[in-house]
Amino acid sequence: YERKNKDEQLLNKETCLILNQLLTAPFNKAFNTYTSATMSAYPTKTTFAVKTGSTSYDSLCAGFNPNYTILSWVGYDDNREMTMATDSKIPKVIFQTMANELQKDESWYKPTEKLQQIPINPISGEYQENGVVYFSLEPKPLHPDV
């Protein structure tokens, strides 16, 4: 018996790019409000998407770009609580170091013609000429007065 693969694309390029772009926000200082964007103190030389997480027992940082996937995790094998204030920073430093060492040239996903890039204020969600780029599948005026 040989299984026959049924090739079926489950995700479309536009949705993937929107999700990838959203995951770059932890590096963007524009998202610093009452608390800092989780990776704003650990910038990388090139674009990466990232997700961080922590509990009392461990901390992780996972990220990717078209060329690399990096995951760093810290915790104790015996499941002890991490009590040092710096413990949750370690995976971020590891991620930053590895990303900067591995990726020398910019490499990021290219938007398709179906996506519109709209600059917005990340706090208000309103149009802002020098705002953070937001991708939309729905046609929207580039400026609310248009």
Task: Give a label for each model feature.
Residues 1-145:
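A penicillin-recognizing enzyme superfamily signal
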